[in-house]
Amino acid sequence: MQIDQLDIQGRRIRYAVRRGSPARTPLLFLNGLGANIELAQPFIDALAEPTVVIFDVPGVGGSPTPAMPYRPSTIARLAARLLDHLGFDEVDVLGVSWGGVIAQQFALQHARRCRRLVLAATAPGLVMVPGRPSVLLKMLTPRRYVDPSHAHRVAGDIYGGMFRRESALVEKTLRHVRFSSRLGYYMQLAALVGWTSVPWLASVRQPTLIMTGIDDPMVPVINARFMRWLIPHARLEILDCGHLFLITLAEQSAHIVEAFLTEPQQQRQAAFSRPLSRRMQ
């Protein structure tokens, strides 16, 4: 990936572009809580063809911590300005976890620019079924990004899936971490306060792929089923993994995303034309 920096809306933003086929619609990748560009590298490498655009949100990775708090709409607008700078009009959008909130906001705020939408390990915000309180308490601190011993202790509880049994995954993931500041982390958390997409998800018209892990302690599967029911043109993929399946099952996840993004229009319509009574299955 080619990494650079750019001033957008008075903020210095670190971003990266992985160049791909000019025949494909570019993919905007919106990362999770405290997650810098490099953490998405395994998944991006597994994607065969599309150009991928990704950036560190303010206060994360190489993007300086902002002086003032922000909202999801702020980051969606920032992403649109970055795409303007790069000369990309229409894009596919993939958001994971916290980035899934931004992806939903982008699909609403910049609907004309969003061709297809992928929501991975995410929820509709305030109106969601949360994980256990003990898991959420561990998420309130970025300590796992800076304290390897703590990360080993809590990774299985937070991320589930393969992190419960493969300690080497923790070390492998930490090698990609570029932690910026605690304030930046808390600003990401604060941005979610009071936000929900439930009132308007039914107005999302983009073909949407919702992905979730069957063993996700942070975002239980019921949230993905709920979003599938709300979004008119949505399908659901449940993977045998935890919260970070884009990392632990990078090849499989990339294959599912690629198939969705390249699916012919007629085939997509057939897949999405299912009875309402089956939406919650």
Predicted regions and their residues:
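Gly/Ala-rich beta-loop-alpha elbow adjacent to hydrolase catalytic centers
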Residues: 95, 99, 103
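Flexible "cap/lid" loop of the alpha/beta hydrolase fold
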Residues: 104, 108, 114-144
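Active-site loop/oxyanion-hole signature of alpha/beta-hydrolase fold enzymes
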Residues: 54-94
